[in-house]
Amino acid sequence: KIGLAHLNSETGLKTDNLSSQLSQHYSFQTVDLSSPINADIDVYLVSGAVDSLDSLVMDNLIAIMDSGKKIFLTQSGILTDIKTQQANPIDSDIFSFLKDHGIILKQNLVLDGKSSKVQVQERRGIFMMNRPMDYPFFPIIQSFNKDEIVVSDLEQVLPFFPSEIQIDTASIDRVAGVIELFKSSSNSGLMEGNYILSPDPQQ
């Protein structure tokens, strides 16, 4: 059984598309991580935090990991808004939780030459026209681990504003092993510090 949880208290959990996909093969329910853990749930799909966590939520995340159950966490190091073209590092204790389990999520953004496009308005005479432009902050992932069933049948994934992940296998004894599921292309790079989110370099 799968539990869907949301760490961002400022926005609601939007699961319509995900729920329709999961319902074809799995039993699932939304869960509140500030409430007692449901022993029937084997895997938790958890959306990312944008602020520090309630102590009950943190205690439950630790208890879930210590019990041997699994957490699939979608977390970025940077809070972004494409409409205002603003980006700021996220200040949250979720990063210390991840680091305690050997995962170092960097506060940067991954860019990739193989990316999706966004529509940019430009003036042509008296008219405003939409023009598609490559947007490297939306990398197109096409490199998957074919030996892992969770991603082996995927053809493409499009993450929005992903951050770099480093795995500490030396100093953390909780890391039994690391399996790479997918990765960006060889044309990828990083943006740190001064975040320029405009898709049009002339703006």
For each feature predicted by the language model, list its residue ranges.
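N-terminal non-catalytic structural scaffold regions of very large proteins
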Residues: 1-2, 10-11
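Acidic, S/T/G-rich, low-cysteine, solvent-exposed domains in lumenal/extracellular/periplasmic regions
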Residues: 11-203
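Short beta-strand/turn micro-motifs composed of small residues
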Residues: 4-6, 75
